[in-house]
């Protein structure tokens, strides 16, 4: 059981999230894709978001914009990045993905070319008790981010979802599935020419993350 468990749990890799083949990963290609780009990570201070930031720090990006509503976790992330990645050009931004004005401010000021959208409420029991907040953040927040990405010409938008969105049986899973449907519908509308834009949307589902905190 221990060996099986070890094989199933591994670190988040940027190359997995960017839609590359799982076999024969070309890290040089990933580096070329991100080189000189401004990258925005929402939920940057959460478990998955912060790990994405750490992974991005190893690539030759132009700037990393870390966006999160949680002040203390963001402060801790800032201290870590400053200590471990001294050459990394990053900016911590406090804000809520549910706020169109704040999101527009971020896109208008930094013009990210790649977005990793990890901001979400994810704890199942809490969301059962607070369904409206799950919908506001996971669905409406995703819509605000996706629409802004298209408006500002983002090249790639990676939505971090959950395996609980598969045949969802709880509020959290339903909210993430709705967010997936919106992103997929927007992507299809762009392909059909119904919405003007060139943003490529990718959805990546995660299972439970060990030692996770809020996203």
Regions found by a protein language model. Name each.
Residues 1-5:
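Short, small-residue-biased leader/transition segments that mark boundaries at the very start
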Residues 7-111:
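N-terminal Rossmann/SDR dinucleotide-binding element
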Residues 61-62, 152-156, 198:
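A short helix->loop->beta-strand "cap" motif at the edges of active sites that frequently abuts
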Residues 92, 134, 201-204:
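Hydrophobic/aromatic anchor residues within beta-strands of the central parallel beta-sheet
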Residues 117, 121-181, 185, 191:
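Conserved Rossmann-fold NAD(P)-dependent oxidoreductase catalytic core, especially the SDR/UDP-sugar
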Residues 141, 211-215:
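Substrate-positioning beta->alpha
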Residues 183-211:
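Conserved beta-loop-beta element that borders a ligand/cofactor-binding pocket
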């Amino acid at each position: 059981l221990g060996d099986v468990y070890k094989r199933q749990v591994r670190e988040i890799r940027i190359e997995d999230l960017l839609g590359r083949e799982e076999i024969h990963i070309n890290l040089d290609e990933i580096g070329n894709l991100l080189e000189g780009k401004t990258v925005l990570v929402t939920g940057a201070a959460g478990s998955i978001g912060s790990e994405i930031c750490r992974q991005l720090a190893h690539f030759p990006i132009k700037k990393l914009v870390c966006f999160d509503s949680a002040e203390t976790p963001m402060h801790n992330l800032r201290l870590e990045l400053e200590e471990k990645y001294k050459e990394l050009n990053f900016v911590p931004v406090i804000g809520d993905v549910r706020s169109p004005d704040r999101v527009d401010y971020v896109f208008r000021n930094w013009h990210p070319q790649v977005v990793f959208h990890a901001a979400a409420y994810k704890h199942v029991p809490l969301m059962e008790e607070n369904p409206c907040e799950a919908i506001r953040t996971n669905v409406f927040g995703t819509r605000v981010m996706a629409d802004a990405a298209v408006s500002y010409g983002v090249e790639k938008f990676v939505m971090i979802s959950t395996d609980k969105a598969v045949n969802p049986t709880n509020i959290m899973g339903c909210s993430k599935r709705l967010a997936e449907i919106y992103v997929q519908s927007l992507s299809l509308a762009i392909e059909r020419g119904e919405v003007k834009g060139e943003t490529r949307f990718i959805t990546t589902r995660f299972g439970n993350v060990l030692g996770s905190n809020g996203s």
